[in-house]
């Protein structure tokens, strides 16, 4: 790809003095500021291929900002997994990050990241001009209520996705070993080696015996367990045109949620990928970018 080296890693310090790492492609005089939030357990660099394709599509019309969220990637902000009870901290971090960018922004994200993007869009409509959600973690109002009740009585401690994350292997002798270990397995079944390699480059640090995941299995599990189930009150406030793209296999966007969301108004538009999984941006990046392009042009 011709633009492959045009994304830089930068550091942003919040008002509490905590350092966050982020990726930026800043194009002078660009038409769009595209701000992207990654999924639970991942990091900004995971989506490098998607960003490269985005730059190839939009050229100097787009600037890209992708934050390593708290406890993820190469950010050094405080992340005590015993204190993580909701996704509010991710929303606060994202709001502050967006405020540091000049001009209005397009908010986007994958999975948890699209919920962070949606809540920020709801809270700051003057700053956010567009919202583009990819495979959101969104359940219907009744499903959400049930999950919140289960959380209150601590019944969701046995959440299988969180249990799986907590048991994830943390250390590897080398990046190559880690890529081999992940290729074709679990969540990474449909990913190419380049996607896996980018996930690991942006989400590991060197230790004496090789490398370790920078998003600890405990933090990842706590993030799953504290999943946001109060999203509907934010979504109802959103008045801008929104585009939601979602898959079918292992989708975190439930049928009940789809039925409820698209009844909120004609400003909620969508595209369904029947052959895609929850990892839609990894599987169909070009198509997702076409969706984004048509959404922004309309």
Task: Describe each region flagged by the PLM.
Residues 63-108, 149, 290:
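Active-site loop/oxyanion-hole signature of alpha/beta-hydrolase fold enzymes
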Residues 104-146:
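Conserved hydrolase catalytic core segment
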Residues 166-225:
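Conserved alpha/beta-hydrolase catalytic His-Asp/Glu region
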Residues 26-77:
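Conserved HGGG/HGGXW glycine-rich cap/lid loop of the alpha/beta-hydrolase fold
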Residues 131-171:
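Flexible "cap/lid" loop of the alpha/beta hydrolase fold
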Residues 203-263:
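Conserved serine/cysteine hydrolase catalytic core
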Residues 15-26:
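A short loop-to-beta-strand scaffold at the N-terminal edge of the catalytic core in hydrolase folds
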Residues 273-285:
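Catalytic histidine-centered segment of alpha/beta-hydrolase-like enzymes
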């Amino acid at each position: 790809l011709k633009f492959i080296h045009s994304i830089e890693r930068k550091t942003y310090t919040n008002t509490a003095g905590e350092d966050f790492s982020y990726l930026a492609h800043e194009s002078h005089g660009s038409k769009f500021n595209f701000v992207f939030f990654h999924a639970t357990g991942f990091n900004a660099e995971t989506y490098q291929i998607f960003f490269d394709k985005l730059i190839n599509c939009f050229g100097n019309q787009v600037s890209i900002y992708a934050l390593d969220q708290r406890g993820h990637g190469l950010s050094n902000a405080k992340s005590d997994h015993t204190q993580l009870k909701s996704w509010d901290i991710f929303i606060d971090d994202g709001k502050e990050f967006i405020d540091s960018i000049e001009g209005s922004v397009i908010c986007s994200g994958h999975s948890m990241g699209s919920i962070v993007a949606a809540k920020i869009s709801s809270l700051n409509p003057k700053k956010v001009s567009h919202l583009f959600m990819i495979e959101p973690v969104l359940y219907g109002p009744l499903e959400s209520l049930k999950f919140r009740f289960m959380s209150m009585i601590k019944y969701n401690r046995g959440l299988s996705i969180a249990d799986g994350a907590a048991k994830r292997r943390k250390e590897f002798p080398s990046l190559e070993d880690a890529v081999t270990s992940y290729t074709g397995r679990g969540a990474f079944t449909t990913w190419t080696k380049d996607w896996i390699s980018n996930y690991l480059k942006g989400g590991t640090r060197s230790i004496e015996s090789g490398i370790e995941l920078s998003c600890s299995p405990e933090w990842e599990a706590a993030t799953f367990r504290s999943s946001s189930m109060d999203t509907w009150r934010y979504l109802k406030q959103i008045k801008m045109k929104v585009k939601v793209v979602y898959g079918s296999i292992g989708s975190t966007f439930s049928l009940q949620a789809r039925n409820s969301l698209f009844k909120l108004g004609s400003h909620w538009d969508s595209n369904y990928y029947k052959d895609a999984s929850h990892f839609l941006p990894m599987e169909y990046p070009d198509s997702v970018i076409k969706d984004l392009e048509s959404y922004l042009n309309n």
